[in-house]
């Protein structure tokens, strides 16, 4: 079966591709996984919802375990029979805080009359899709807000615990991906390649700083160097402190990033 467990069409369901980030779940046996933004790129992902899923793995070890995963309740971690609505959280901008154009603003996908109409659930709930943002990393702060690292800006996106956007998208000063709103509007030139934004993000053990790691080198920086920018969570601004990660070889790439303690 090339489609996995369920064959299309997917009535009231959505295929899910790879996981990009993970957080602790509601209990010690569950984890929260964030899916990648869509199915190939911004131009093919307008109806792909940006979601997190609660997953309960049964690790296979020397003493037992099946090595399988199952759905769990997002709020409690309790086992579920399938990945139904209680197992997931979907990002939304119902309060219109993001200050970016999103698919829910349009009648037709991509604001193109030749495309299908925007799904009513996306429209009504102002649900965020893979054409709006490319979230690759996520951290939960000490106030239970969530911070998402995006690649289209690159932007930092702040939501509450329910996935509702709390403020405008935060740009990284001086860095512009091709999809950044200022590049699209002709106000800036891109200096970061596509899919080069915040692939990895760590949070300090105190929960007061984020460290956002770019996936690609900014134009003009030494080849093979990736910027890590420090962000003050309480002040909601970049501190100006910047670090550099050196790739060992050109074909290497980074994934996620985790702080072990305050200085490492």
Where are the model-predicted features located?
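Sequence/structural signature of beta-propeller domains
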Residues: 1-264
């Amino acid at each position: 079966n090339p489609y996995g467990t369920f064959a299309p069409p997917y009535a009231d369901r959505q295929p899910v591709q790879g996981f990009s980030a993970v957080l602790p779940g509601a209990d010690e046996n569950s984890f929260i996984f964030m899916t990648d933004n869509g199915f190939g790129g911004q131009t093919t992902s307008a109806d792909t919802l940006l979601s997190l899923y609660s997953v309960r793995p049964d690790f296979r070890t020397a003493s037992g375990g099946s090595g399988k995963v199952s759905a769990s309740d997002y709020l409690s971690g309790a086992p579920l029979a399938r990945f139904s609505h209680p197992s997931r959280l979907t990002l939304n901008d119902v309060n219109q805080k993001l200050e970016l154009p999103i698919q829910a603003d349009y009648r037709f996908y991509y604001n193109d009359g030749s495309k299908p109409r925007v799904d009513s659930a996306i429209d009504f709930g102002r649900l965020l899709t893979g054409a709006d943002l490319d979230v690759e990393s996520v951290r939960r702060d000490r106030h239970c807000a969530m911070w998402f690292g995006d690649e289209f800006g690159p932007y930092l996106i702040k939501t509450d615990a329910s996935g509702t956007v709390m403020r405008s998208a935060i740009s990284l000063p001086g860095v512009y991906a091709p999809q950044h709103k200022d590049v699209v509007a002709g106000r800036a030139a891109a200096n970061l390649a596509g899919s080069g934004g915040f692939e990895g993000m760590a949070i300090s053990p105190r929960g007061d700083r984020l460290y956002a790691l770019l996936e690609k080198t900014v134009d003009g920086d030494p080849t093979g160097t990736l910027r890590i920018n420090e962000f003050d969570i309480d002040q909601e601004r970049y501190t100006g402190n910047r670090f550099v990660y050196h790739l060992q070889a050109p074909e290497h790439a980074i994934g996620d990033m985790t702080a072990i303690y305050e200085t490492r």
